[in-house]
């Protein structure tokens, strides 16, 4: 019986790359694996898929196959045959297919277990707006794991040392077989460390690390804002058995301010003015983060008008120009008026009457003219 083309076996084109070949192989190997497929021809198809994969993922064998076809691997042709006498090691195949899950890129082979780097930590820091804009130094206390001083982080009592695990021979992993299946898992004897501590340190009980609250000084750069993160390298948890420590990330949150709101590099505030000043003009004192300044209020200023004070905002921690302070004027209505004051206001209002009223209250005139037109249209 003639042999099928290897590209046809895997269902890929002749221009397929190694990634596509491997993807097709995994899919077909799972489909025809004898432990999953009880059909009579499943084993033969499985062997065929395995052989095609081995040839097409070996650069030299693939080049020979592309030039000579199956003849390149027939006995006596100098190609050396397909290897393995046409048999298939289902345990190895399982490792190839699931190696990235159980054994990493090593295709299910044992890998040296290393002491793990320490975990990163996060500290939430609240700053006032002034602290965030100007920068400051803060002292913080962080509960963490540090290397044990008694054993220098080894976990073993002074004068002793850890020995190689006899179960995994220092690899940290063992292979468990169930029928055709081969699965790698952490060594149950040394818990994946590859070493056994027979005489543990009394201070850390063989862990190499102890709990401690560290006091750290954190320098906050000027211009930080909510959401910014400051990294303190090596100030996280100590690593296992002398491995590098993790990092500490200080997460910044800027508290609300009683006067200012921040948006990027700009600051916003509301400035109340009397209706008299809004009408006739004047000056009002405005606070900034660098002191007080006077803002000129033009006559006939309406409530909600914005005034920009350039360079009175924030300089970003990332550099660039300083932002602006944007002041929104709010005209206050007087309250707690005496009878005399109310009479004076009524006289002022009456002085706006007559045909010239519109020029004193342009928005009111426009509004009421619009209302009149609206009802005229409804009834017309």
Swiss-Prot record:
<dbReference type="GO" id="GO:0008270">
    <property type="term" value="F:zinc ion binding"/>
</dbReference>
<dbReference type="GO" id="GO:0031072">
    <property type="term" value="F:heat shock protein binding"/>
</dbReference>
<dbReference type="Pfam" id="PF00226">
    <property type="entry name" value="DnaJ"/>
</dbReference>
<feature type="zinc finger region" description="CR-type">
    <location>
        <begin position="135"/>
        <end position="213"/>
    </location>
</feature>
<feature type="domain" description="J">
    <location>
        <begin position="5"/>
        <end position="69"/>
    </location>
</feature>
<keyword id="KW-0863">Zinc-finger</keyword>
<comment type="function">
    <text>Participates actively in the response to hyperosmotic and heat shock by preventing the aggregation of stress-denatured proteins and by disaggregating proteins, also in an autonomous, DnaK-independent fashion. Unfolded proteins bind initially to DnaJ; upon interaction with the DnaJ-bound protein, DnaK hydrolyzes its bound ATP, resulting in the formation of a stable complex. GrpE releases ADP from DnaK; ATP binding to DnaK triggers the release of the substrate protein, thus completing the reaction cycle.</text>
</comment>
<dbReference type="GO" id="GO:0005737">
    <property type="term" value="C:cytoplasm"/>
</dbReference>
<dbReference type="GO" id="GO:0051082">
    <property type="term" value="F:unfolded protein binding"/>
</dbReference>
<dbReference type="GO" id="GO:0005524">
    <property type="term" value="F:ATP binding"/>
</dbReference>
<comment type="subunit">
    <text>Homodimer.</text>
</comment>
<protein>
    <recommendedName>
        <fullName>Chaperone protein DnaJ</fullName>
    </recommendedName>
</protein>
<feature type="repeat" description="CXXCXGXG motif">
    <location>
        <begin position="201"/>
        <end position="208"/>
    </location>
</feature>
<keyword id="KW-0143">Chaperone</keyword>
<keyword id="KW-0479">Metal-binding</keyword>
<keyword id="KW-0677">Repeat</keyword>
<keyword id="KW-0862">Zinc</keyword>
<dbReference type="InterPro" id="IPR018253">
    <property type="entry name" value="DnaJ_domain_CS"/>
</dbReference>
<feature type="binding site">
    <location>
        <position position="204"/>
    </location>
    <ligand>
        <name>Zn(2+) 1</name>
    </ligand>
</feature>
<dbReference type="InterPro" id="IPR036869">
    <property type="entry name" value="J_dom_sf"/>
</dbReference>
<keyword id="KW-0235">DNA replication</keyword>
<dbReference type="GO" id="GO:0006260">
    <property type="term" value="P:DNA replication"/>
</dbReference>
<dbReference type="GO" id="GO:0009408">
    <property type="term" value="P:response to heat"/>
</dbReference>
<dbReference type="GO" id="GO:0051085">
    <property type="term" value="P:chaperone cofactor-dependent protein refolding"/>
</dbReference>
<feature type="binding site">
    <location>
        <position position="165"/>
    </location>
    <ligand>
        <name>Zn(2+) 2</name>
    </ligand>
</feature>
<dbReference type="Pfam" id="PF01556">
    <property type="entry name" value="DnaJ_C"/>
</dbReference>
<dbReference type="InterPro" id="IPR001623">
    <property type="entry name" value="DnaJ_domain"/>
</dbReference>
<dbReference type="InterPro" id="IPR036410">
    <property type="entry name" value="HSP_DnaJ_Cys-rich_dom_sf"/>
</dbReference>
<feature type="binding site">
    <location>
        <position position="201"/>
    </location>
    <ligand>
        <name>Zn(2+) 1</name>
    </ligand>
</feature>
<feature type="repeat" description="CXXCXGXG motif">
    <location>
        <begin position="187"/>
        <end position="194"/>
    </location>
</feature>
<dbReference type="GO" id="GO:0042026">
    <property type="term" value="P:protein refolding"/>
</dbReference>
<feature type="binding site">
    <location>
        <position position="187"/>
    </location>
    <ligand>
        <name>Zn(2+) 2</name>
    </ligand>
</feature>
<dbReference type="InterPro" id="IPR008971">
    <property type="entry name" value="HSP40/DnaJ_pept-bd"/>
</dbReference>
<dbReference type="Pfam" id="PF00684">
    <property type="entry name" value="DnaJ_CXXCXGXG"/>
</dbReference>
<feature type="binding site">
    <location>
        <position position="168"/>
    </location>
    <ligand>
        <name>Zn(2+) 2</name>
    </ligand>
</feature>
<comment type="similarity">
    <text>Belongs to the DnaJ family.</text>
</comment>
<keyword id="KW-0963">Cytoplasm</keyword>
<feature type="binding site">
    <location>
        <position position="190"/>
    </location>
    <ligand>
        <name>Zn(2+) 2</name>
    </ligand>
</feature>
<feature type="repeat" description="CXXCXGXG motif">
    <location>
        <begin position="148"/>
        <end position="155"/>
    </location>
</feature>
<dbReference type="InterPro" id="IPR002939">
    <property type="entry name" value="DnaJ_C"/>
</dbReference>
<dbReference type="InterPro" id="IPR012724">
    <property type="entry name" value="DnaJ"/>
</dbReference>
<dbReference type="InterPro" id="IPR001305">
    <property type="entry name" value="HSP_DnaJ_Cys-rich_dom"/>
</dbReference>
């Amino acid at each position: 019986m003639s042999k099928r083309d290897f590209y046809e076996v895997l269902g890929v084109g002749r221009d397929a790359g190694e990634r596509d070949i491997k993807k097709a192989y995994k899919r077909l190997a799972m489909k025809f694996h004898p432990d999953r497929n009880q059909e009579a021809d499943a084993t033969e198809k499985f062997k065929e898929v395995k052989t095609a994969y081995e040839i097409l993922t070996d650069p030299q064998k693939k080049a020979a196959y592309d030039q000579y076809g199956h003849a390149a691997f027939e006995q006596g042709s100098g190609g050396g045959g397909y290897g393995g006498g046409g048999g298939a090691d289902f345990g190895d195949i399982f490792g190839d297919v699931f190696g990235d899950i159980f054994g990493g890129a090593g295709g299910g082979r044992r890998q040296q277990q290393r002491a793990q780097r320490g975990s990163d930590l996060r500290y939430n820091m609240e700053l006032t707006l002034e602290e965030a804009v100007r920068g400051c130094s803060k002292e913080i206390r962080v509960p963490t794991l540090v290397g044990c001083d008694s054993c220098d982080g080894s976990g073993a009592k002074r004068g002793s040392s850890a020995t190689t695990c006899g179960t995994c021979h220092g690899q940290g992993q063992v292979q468990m077989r169930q029928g055709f299946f081969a699965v790698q898992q952490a060594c149950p004897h040394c818990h994946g460390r590859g070493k056994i501590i027979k005489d543990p340190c009394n201070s850390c009980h063989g862990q190499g690390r102890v709990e401690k609250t560290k006091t750290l000084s954190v320098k906050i750069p000027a211009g930080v804002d909510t959401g910014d993160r400051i990294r303190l390298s090596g100030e996280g948890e100590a690593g296992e058995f002398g491995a590098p420590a993790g990092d500490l990330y200080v997460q910044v949150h800027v508290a609300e301010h009683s006067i200012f709101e921040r948006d990027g590099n700009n600051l916003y505030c509301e400035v109340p003015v009397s209706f008299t000043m809004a009408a006739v003009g004047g000056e009002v004192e405005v606070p900034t983060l660098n002191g007080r300044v006077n803002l000129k209020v033009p006559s006939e200023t309406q409530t909600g008008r914005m005034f920009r004070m350039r360079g009175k905002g924030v300089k970003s921690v990332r550099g660039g120009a300083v932002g602006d302070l944007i002041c929104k004027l709010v005209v206050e209505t007087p309250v707690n008026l005496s009878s005399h004051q109310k009479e004076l206001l009524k006289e002022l209002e009456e002085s706006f009457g007559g045909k010239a009223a519109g020029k004193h209250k342009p928005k009111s005139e426009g509004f009421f003219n619009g209302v009149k037109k609206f009802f005229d249209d409804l009834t017309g």
